[in-house]
């Protein structure tokens, strides 16, 4: 028995052993086959555990007292390129610690926590299920840019666009006025959207109507146009209102027929401060003008939020006015307010409210709403004259008879509404309500970013002198402590280290180079703009005389700014955007003189203009001195260095300057090439003969033609880079202007022919220039072959406009400067210019171009030198190209003469040397970033120029010139003498020619 039991035990043990052996063998086989996967999974699990532990620690530290549950669907990803940057992480943690805990800032833990979550879980594989909600996926175009112009227009998410697209693909809609099933369904959808809008703003049941418009401006216009104005009415408005609200003033004046003192009353922003005393001041103003006549209504209009400064005005004022003066109806411009804040129509039952939906969720544009309290609409919006399809119950063609529809929305919506875009609105509201957890989350998120950004901006100072100069001045009525008083807008200007202001146009230019997109100007809010900038009526009138208008580049006039810079935040912004913006300010404006041209001065006279300057040093356009014909080199140079140049570079440059002190420079500076640009913004024509004629406006035929759009504004390469591909040629022998372009027939235009159509509204840099337009009746020739390959090219060309249209793809026209036009130079009013921007002549130095290219190659180590071959002298569109000498020495000259090589080599000459004055540095814009070979816009060379070639905040390269005189060479005298004005005047009877090549001799320098 014992033996039997032992036998059984041995058998069982053998079976177990055999089973384990087989199992282990199979397991090892599986493990071998999936070794890499298991390793990856183990690593992922470890990483996930580590990350989860980190996140738990972070969330426990930052998120102890949650008041609002984290919205899992909203993940705002920082995607910071500097994940290992300790400074970045430190700043990010400081930001989170402050704005997730400190309740005085009004922040409750929501969107920022999601941002934190995504930041630390960026590489966590367990977070893949949320990838469709992060910033990169929802806003892929923001990957490499920082968008800070949400007050103008926010952005639509990919989810929103996809849902709209899906509905358009799967559903069918038609005119809601049709009574077929599809039309009825469409009308139901539109009415449903009306209800959604009223619910979103918590409107009392059946007390409000939604009238769809093309936008907030159209809504305001309708109120002004339809309002029940009488001779006893008055229009009150906040001084800090948008132009669209101010425009109602014209309806009031026209309808009331009174003067400015009786028709309207502007209210200073000070009166809107949220306290009883200021409210009483406003109520007193209304009371002083209140009419007891029950038939008269007045209108009080103000913005819920100032689009200039972000100041929020007290909404309680609505109730106060309505309670005390029921005949004074209140109009709220809520476009800026509701973009990042809520509004409650039950709490603040305003009579009329206007909004634009693209400011709320980016798409669709062209849709707004006028939200009307029904009782106020029936009593006050009664002056509508026009009726149209959809607005009447019945009308007659034979006589003046029609009956309006009873409901406000039907009566005030003329024609077929934009039903497709209206239906798209629901997807925008879904983004706010569902994915973002409500507009209050958006407000808290954007306000936190705004607060932090403002605080960081105010920490920035220039620190290179004994008296610290703050970098930014912020225009606001409050301290950004309360989200009920301040929105997500920061308006500011930037100080230079010397206390002067940077022009806002220069700030925008540098921001664009850093892929930061913001807004500059006055933002269509003249009251706020002029008030904050302390601009008087006299200042504004003088600005207008000086040619300054809205949207131009004149940012500083008479030492005062004409506008400012505005940044604004949307829900898709995050800490990384603020971080990049603050670093942009630090790297581009702090101690701004380090970006300026470094000044090299000479104590001794120099010969033949040879101001010997190192290739690595740029000189200032504010240098000076005297030059003569004696001496053979450079002596006793004094170099003024920026205090912030790094020590290594400073020592290297000092050593190079010391070498230059003892060097005898025999380089000869020559005018080597002349270019004219017959058609403004098209390619240039190189002078191939040895001379070219000068005329009062500059080089003959230079910028004598321009291309304009249908509005009469000239078109340049910044608007249409393809213009760079239009080649121009002046054929003097055959009297032709010749235009060629890829795959187009050659177009030739007689030089001696002037068009018969006068056109005097051409806008060039703020000036109105008289021009002659080539119309259908004007003559031109086209050759039978195209300029590019293919032969056929542009097809039949009946006129010049058709040729331009076939190549450009846009309807535009060619205009020639009228012979009677005598437009004055921007930099020297004693000189004429044609369609040029500022001066008759522009000069650049080949050596300066070469130095710039070296810097570009050095600053872009990932590229190869050939990548930058497209950057050349042609990028700068100069008339005069000089060679020889040193880079940037042209900045030193105040006056020089050009001596023909023929004159230099012979004792007799039929013409005299020509004298030119330097009248200013050329302020560069993104025009130089147009690849002249490809007709596309690039980032360089403006980006590199901005790092070392600034003067007074402007980015400069090249010199503006004017023609001063010709020189009579008299063998009996050793000195050069200038001709009298009669002798030197440019006229057909006394033509003056500039020769190529010519030797350049400096007559004087600039200090």
From Swiss-Prot:
Domain MOSC stretches: 816-995
InterPro entries to which the protein is assigned, alphabetical: Aminotrans_V_dom (IPR000192), MoCF_Sase_C (IPR005302), MoCo_sulfurase (IPR028886), MOCOS_middle (IPR005303), PyrdxlP-dep_Trfase (IPR015424), PyrdxlP-dep_Trfase_major (IPR015421), PyrdxlP-dep_Trfase_small (IPR015422)
Cofactor(s) this protein cannot do without: pyridoxal 5'-phosphate
Protein origin, superkingdom: Eukaryota
Record's catalysed reaction(s): Mo-molybdopterin + L-cysteine + AH2 = thio-Mo-molybdopterin + L-alanine + A + H2O
Uppermost EC category: transferase
Residues annotated as catalytic: 524
Pathway(s) annotated for this protein in UniProt: Cofactor biosynthesis; molybdopterin biosynthesis
One annotated GO biological process: molybdopterin cofactor metabolic process
Coiled-coil spans in chain: none
Annotated region (Disordered), positions in chain: 33-60, 117-138
Compositionally biased spans, kind Low complexity: 33-55, 121-133
Described function: Sulfurates the molybdenum cofactor. Sulfation of molybdenum is essential for xanthine dehydrogenase (XDH) and aldehyde oxidase (ADO) enzymes in which molybdenum cofactor is liganded by 1 oxygen and 1 sulfur atom in active form.
Family, similarity comment: Belongs to the class-V pyridoxal-phosphate-dependent aminotransferase family. MOCOS subfamily.
Designated name of the protein: Molybdenum cofactor sulfurase
